[in-house]
Amino acid sequence: PKALFLFSPFKSENISQIDHNLNSSNLFSSGRIGQNDSLEGGNSLTLGFDYSVNSQNDREIFSSNIGQIFRDKNDEKLPLKTSMNNKSSDLIGNIKFSPREELIIDYDFNADNNLDTINYSFLTAKVSVNNFITSFEFLEENNNVGSESYFSRKISYEFNEGNLLSFNTRRNRKRD
């Protein structure tokens, strides 16, 4: 379990329109609003947990982390894309699975606090066989996080450490 309590006697500056995403890597940071010259005002408590499974040779096979921010009251001056302005933020997390060194699957997500909507979903997968590397990305943003959505794939052949040949495609998905 992890916990972060932030207290500021000052009110937040109005940064509600900045383009900043909250993710599992900055959720437990005091600078999570993404502004060097501004502090998050009011009181907040961030709760979450990390879990990992390692192989016998200490290689990480599975890891997950999930967290959520709780505030004593709404603060409409905080970034709308992050849901930090609500009493309880989105549930934010990451799941990584790598059963072998040749396969890595990584998933970042933001789920609405009542878990009925996924507001942000970013899935990456990478498969390496000999010198061939294939990777896939899928992004979907909903509601206040944004409206971008795409699927991309990259196929590469690595001749040596400094030379490779790659082929990339990306399909943007248009949503209303």
Please report, for each region that a protein language model flagged, where it lies by residue:
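Outer-membrane beta-barrel translocator/pore domains, especially the C-terminal barrels
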Residues: 2-176
